[in-house]
Curated annotation (Swiss-Prot):
Family: Belongs to the RNA polymerase alpha chain family.
GO cellular component: cytoplasm; DNA-directed RNA polymerase complex
Keywords from the named record: DNA-directed RNA polymerase, Nucleotidyltransferase, Transcription, Transferase
Domain remark text: The N-terminal domain is essential for RNAP assembly and basal transcription, whereas the C-terminal domain is involved in interaction with transcriptional regulators and with upstream promoter elements.
Annotated region described as Alpha N-terminal domain (alpha-NTD), given as residue ranges: 1-234
Protein known as: DNA-directed RNA polymerase subunit alpha
Listed GO MF terms: DNA binding; DNA-directed RNA polymerase activity; protein dimerization activity
Enzyme Commission identifier(s): 2.7.7.6
Domain of life: Bacteria
InterPro entries given in the database record: DNA-dir_RNA_pol_insert, DNA-dir_RNA_pol_RpoA/D/Rpb3, DNA-dir_RpoA, RBP11-like, RNAP_asu_C, RNApol_insert_sf
Gene: rpoA
Length: 329
């Protein structure tokens, strides 16, 4: 395979092996040597930490005041119930949070299928066991599910909660990422005579709320959007060069009529071809006094008007007049 030494091979999606509904293997090749680990590690970190999803954040169980207790007639203690609730795979459409309710009595397992919710909520794993009832007892709880990203421990949210949080409202460590497991492997690849290439194999398992292939696509989009800032560095620099300060103060480009001088003074300046304020400030007092019909009274008027605008006579302006005015003169 012949090509420029500065050209990089572009990977292509070679194979998507759907192991089951929640697990898939994605293979990309060929990659330049070293790019397998570079891309694999970046995608892995994004998939684990930056994928948006839904998770249980708060739980209220009737008759329970804190998580270090137990409930009569329930086989599991409260901490184990909270751990099981973290395993719910939920999606929410059209809003950022939802309140679910669970109420069941009798004997046997309590599963996610026993949860009551509105049409905007979908529970992907209805067979997920939450707890077991014994001795014909009952349990009721309210479960808050929120949309988020990454991992947010309960302790972090507790610090931002108000002190008037009701007793019995239990905060849950929230893992919002829909990716349950992600691993990658870099193997050797060959294209024609080149044998020093990489093949990236990504093995991923989700909680069922997102298709593995879609998760890969979203993570790659997130990475590309973040890298766009580096691609635009040159454009930002060029734009900054273009946006330089104007060569002259805009007031110097205005006609002398804007100074609202007396008719006598204005006519004297026009007779001397002084059309713009920039023309005027370059003249000295001696030069103006040589102007026919312009006396000391008019000179004083001109000096006062210029001073009120932060200007004075005898100023030196390099490259005057600018091209835009020179064309009009």
């Amino acid at each position: 395979m012949q090509g420029s030494v500065t050209e990089f091979l572009k990977p292509r999606l070679v194979d998507i092996e759907q192991v089951n509904s929640t697990r898939a293997k994605v293979t990309l090749e060929p990659l330049e040597r070293g790019f397998g680990h570079t891309l694999g590690n970046a995608l892995r970190r994004i998939l684990l930490s930056s994928m948006p999803g839904c998770a249980v954040t708060e739980v209220e169980i009737d008759g329970v005041l804190h998580e270090y207790s137990s409930k009569e007639g329930v086989q599991e203690d409260i901490l184990e119930i909270l751990l099981n609730l973290k395993g719910l795979a939920v999606t929410i459409e059209g809003k950022d949070e939802a309140l679910l309710t669970l109420s069941k009595s009798g004997t046997g397992p309590v599963t996610a299928a026993d949860i009551t919710h509105d049409g905007d909520v979908t529970i992907v794993n209805p067979d997920h066991v939450i707890c077991h009832l014994t001795g014909n007892n009952d349990i009721s709880m309210r479960i808050r599910v929120e949309r988020g990203r990454g991992y947010v421990p309960a302790s972090a949210r507790a610090q931002t909660e108000d002190d008037d949080r009701p007793i019995g409202r239990l905060l849950v460590d929230a893992s919002f990422s829909p990716v349950a497991r992600i691993a990658y492997n870099v193997e050797a690849a060959r294209v024609e005579q080149r044998t020093d290439l990489d093949k990236l194999v990504i093995d991923m398992t989700t909680n069922g709320t997102i298709d593995p292939e879609e998760a890969i696509r979203r993570s790659a989009t997130i990475l590309a959007e973040q890298l766009d800032a580096f691609v635009e560095l040159r454009d930002v620099t060029e734009q900054a060069v273009v946006e330089e300060k104007p060569e002259f103060d805009p007031i110097l480009l205005r006609p002398v009529d804007d100074l609202e001088l007396t008719v006598r003074s204005a006519n004297c300046l026009k007779a001397e071809a002084i059309h713009y304020i920039g023309d005027l400030v370059q003249r000295t007092e001696v030069e103006l006094l040589k102007t026919p019909n312009l006396g000391k009274k008019s000179l004083t008027e001109i000096k006062d008007v210029l001073a009120s605008r932060g200007l004075s006579l005898g100023m030196r302006l390099e490259n005057w007049p600018p091209a835009s005015l020179a064309d009009d003169l």
